[in-house]
Amino acid sequence: MTSSLYRRIYSGDSLYSAWRKVKESAFSSSSETIRNEAKDFESQLPKSLSDIQRALSKKTFTFQKQTGVAKTKANGNSRPIVLSPIPNRIVQRALLDALSRIKFVKEALDTPTSYGGIRNKRVSMAVADAKEAISKGAAFHIRSDIAEFFTRIDKARVVELVAPHIKCPDTLALFQAAITTDLANIDVLRRQGLDEIFPLGVEGVAQGSPLSPLIANLYLHDFDKTMNDGDVICLRYIDDFLILGKDMGRVDRAFNKAQRELKKLSLHAYQPSATSDKASRGLTANGFDFLGCFLSAGLIQPSTITRERFKKRVKSDLDASIRMMKFSIEAGDIFPKGSYSGALQNLDRVILGWGKAFSFCSNGHWIKSLDDYITSALAQYEMEKTNLFQKTNGTAQRTMLGVRLLAAVHSERTEME
């Protein structure tokens, strides 16, 4: 007999709520492919959700193959991101909502010093709690993150953690399937030598899955409890953590304890050093980076690394648009994201998303500095676009602008008929 927990997963209310959250995330994505996939799914409602509900109720739902994307990090290494089809994400989200009602899971998510991937908790809260601890006398810190965290998670251990509390074979089987990675483009990644960074075996969970933050918080629940039972405070946001204490000795001992706890999970944290951007150690009065912010006395602002990364993203997107406009002229076709109008819309979304993410930071010169940079980058972009314009005719100019030709629309319709 189907359990109430499993029935909750495929209830109409649960699936529709999951779709709303997936839709919000997809529509705000800078990826046109993801936005279009969500639009296609929405255009087929309510059938698209009914199909998922029917498959789940009959226990025939299967997760579609995902796409692996090797995202280049600032240090030149690749971060494995797994992009799942909309139906996968809806079921993962519905599963997340159902599991979040289980007592064991609720206790883990209620941990006061854990912030990432938890409803109604945000980066700003972790930063605010760090500032409060400093104001109460925490004069020293160690900040670090757990090396290769998501790719080192033992999936079998995750299942062992939740199985005694789920007590439903159907839900457990769905959970196991939901955290399994099966890539459609694995051959391409293998030829590029990138297949080994993806969580295809017993180790690792997909970054990008709605379930990944939950798994992280369950996996590190004992770590959170152990690290906050002494005379320091340890704030954690997924795989980043900050230890604050009244003297350096206490903080150092706490960090050594953190390494011992992580070793039990076959994990380790980066050692603080003057040359590393992964970890830091010292006086809180001197300021330090945490969760993309720089914290110092009376001031919270995006860190230098965060701001440089944002500027690089702005320039990279505008440069890519110029290249794609040139290609559009040669191909005689529109590439929306690379067109003039598409590039400006994309940049506006990037600015809005980044600005909201750091809206809790203190006002300061950094805001004007970034706005000045964007204005300068746009002026350069406008100049390059104008140079291209002067070398083309009206039809090519329309293509560059991202405004399709009526004749092309008519031609497409004729071909379909």
What are these regions (language model features)?
Residues M1-S50, A55, K385, T395-R398, ...:
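Non-catalytic, polymerase-adjacent accessory regions of viral genome-replication enzymes
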Residues I34, G76-P80, T111-T113, S144, ...:
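Glycine- and acidic
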Residues A55-G76, D97, F175-D195:
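Reverse-transcriptase-like RNA-dependent polymerase core
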Residues R93, E196, K225, D252, ...:
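Right-hand nucleic-acid polymerase module
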Residues E132-I238, L242-E261, G282, G287, ...:
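Conserved polymerase palm-domain catalytic core
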